[in-house]
UniProtKB/Swiss-Prot annotation:
<dbReference type="GO" id="GO:0005576">
    <property type="term" value="C:extracellular region"/>
</dbReference>
<keyword id="KW-0443">Lipid metabolism</keyword>
<feature type="binding site">
    <location>
        <position position="45"/>
    </location>
    <ligand>
        <name>Ca(2+)</name>
    </ligand>
</feature>
<dbReference type="InterPro" id="IPR033112">
    <property type="entry name" value="PLipase_A2_Asp_AS"/>
</dbReference>
<keyword id="KW-1015">Disulfide bond</keyword>
<keyword id="KW-0106">Calcium</keyword>
<dbReference type="GO" id="GO:0047498">
    <property type="term" value="F:calcium-dependent phospholipase A2 activity"/>
</dbReference>
<dbReference type="InterPro" id="IPR001211">
    <property type="entry name" value="PLipase_A2"/>
</dbReference>
<keyword id="KW-0800">Toxin</keyword>
<feature type="disulfide bond">
    <location>
        <begin position="91"/>
        <end position="102"/>
    </location>
</feature>
<protein>
    <recommendedName>
        <fullName>Acidic phospholipase A2 pgPLA 1b/pgPLA 2b</fullName>
        <ecNumber>3.1.1.4</ecNumber>
    </recommendedName>
</protein>
<feature type="disulfide bond">
    <location>
        <begin position="66"/>
        <end position="104"/>
    </location>
</feature>
<dbReference type="GO" id="GO:0016042">
    <property type="term" value="P:lipid catabolic process"/>
</dbReference>
<dbReference type="GO" id="GO:0005509">
    <property type="term" value="F:calcium ion binding"/>
</dbReference>
<feature type="disulfide bond">
    <location>
        <begin position="73"/>
        <end position="97"/>
    </location>
</feature>
<feature type="signal peptide">
    <location>
        <begin position="1"/>
        <end position="16"/>
    </location>
</feature>
<keyword id="KW-0378">Hydrolase</keyword>
Length: 138
C-alpha cells in the first residue's frame, strides 16, 4: 500500500512531455524514471540545489542545466517528436526548441543508463535539508 501511495504522489506533478521523458528513460535503461529518479539526490525530481551527490544525481543536475539553456518553449510541458532506430533515440522535430528539449532528455536517459551502477538507495527521497552546499555553475 505504501508503494502505491508513493507512486501516486510522484505522478501528481507529471505533465505534458514529462511522460515522454519517462518513456524515454524506460526505453534506454529498462527502469521507470519516475520510480528511480523522481526523487533522488539533490537534483532528480522537483527543484534542485546544492551539489550532486553521485553520478546519477549529476545526470539530473546536467539535465536541469540543459533545460535552463532552452528558449522559446516550455521544456516541461511541450511535446516533442522522437523515435527509436536500431536501439538509439533519434530526436526529430521541425521546432528547434522542442528538438533541444528532446536532446536534453536523451542525454539524461543515456547518462542514467551509463551510471546505473552508481545508484545508491541512500539518496532515494534524500532530504532537501542535506542539499545546502554551494552549487556549482552549469
Amino acid at each position: 500500500m505504501r508503494t502505491l501511495w508513493i507512486m501516486a504522489v510522484l505522478l501528481v506533478g507529471v505533465k505534458g512531455h514529462l511522460m515522454q521523458f519517462e518513456n524515454m528513460i524506460k526505453k534506454v535503461t529498462g527502469r521507470s524514471g519516475i520510480w528511480w529518479y523522481g526523487s533522488y539526490g539533490c537534483y532528480c525530481g522537483k527543484g534542485g540545489e546544492g551539489r550532486p551527490q553521485d553520478p546519477s544525481d549529476r545526470c539530473c543536475f546536467v539535465h536541469d542545466c540543459c533545460y535552463g539553456k532552452v528558449t522559446g518553449c516550455d521544456p516541461k510541458d511541450d511535446f516533442y517528436i522522437y523515435s527509436s532506430e536500431n536501439g538509439d533515440i533519434v530526436c526529430g522535430d521541425d521546432d528547434l526548441c522542442k528538438k533541444e528539449v528532446c536532446e536534453c532528455d536523451k542525454a539524461a536517459a543515456i547518462c542514467f543508463r551509463d551510471n546505473m551502477d552508481t545508484y545508491q538507495n541512500k539518496y532515494w527521497f534524500y532530504p532537501a535539508s542535506n542539499c545546502k552546499e554551494e552549487s556549482e555553475p552549469c
